[in-house]
């Protein structure tokens, strides 16, 4: 069994606070129509591409028409990335899952 030191807990809390700070910054950027320039500043082209791929993974998992292996081939993503997306989707709050289905699949 691994014990977490108070130091690692403090680091985890600091990282969580930094994440929440970013989320608030992004919320403010949306309110002022500066979200695209902010995201372009904060994310590399590869990171933006990876986020787009993750949206596609979630979309296809919600659609349920392809196996994870087929998704791997179709999207060029690693099977571990697809499995993480699947596991995250399974543990997502029901409200979020319904919202994602409505937003991602409504025009499909």
UniProtKB/Swiss-Prot annotation:
Keyword Secreted: no
Subcellular location field: Cytoplasm
Superkingdom of source: Bacteria
DNA-binding span(s): 68-91
Primary location: cytoplasm
Keywords from the named record: Cytoplasm, DNA-binding, Repressor, Transcription, Transcription regulation
GO MF annotations, alphabetized: DNA-binding transcription factor activity; sequence-specific DNA binding
Alphabetized Pfam families for the sequence: Trp_repressor
UniProt keyword DNA-binding, yes or no: yes
Gene Ontology CC annotations of this record: cytoplasm
Gene Ontology biological-process annotations: negative regulation of DNA-templated transcription
PANTHER family: TRP OPERON REPRESSOR (PTHR38025:SF1)
Subunit-structure text: Homodimer.
Role this protein plays: This protein is an aporepressor. When complexed with L-tryptophan it binds the operator region of the trp operon (5'-ACTAGT-'3') and prevents the initiation of transcription. The complex also regulates trp repressor biosynthesis by binding to its regulatory region.
Annotated HAMAP family: Trp_repressor
Family: Belongs to the TrpR family.
NCBIfam families xref list: TrpR (TIGR01321)
Designated name of the protein: Trp operon repressor
Organism: Salmonella enteritidis PT4 (strain P125109)
UniProt gene name: trpR
């Amino acid at each position: 069994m691994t014990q977490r030191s108070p130091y690692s807990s403090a680091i985890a809390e600091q990282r969580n606070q930094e994440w929440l700070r970013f989320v608030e910054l992004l919320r403010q950027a949306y309110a002022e129509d500066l979200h695209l320039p902010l995201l372009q500043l904060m994310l590399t082209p590869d990171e933006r591409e990876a986020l787009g791929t993750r949206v596609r993974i979630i979309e296809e998992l919600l659609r349920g028409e392809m196996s994870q292996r087929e998704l791997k081939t179709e999207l060029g993503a690693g099977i571990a990335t697809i499995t993480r997306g699947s596991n995250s989707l399974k543990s997502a709050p029901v409200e979020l899952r319904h919202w994602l289905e409505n937003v991602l699949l409504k025009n499909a």
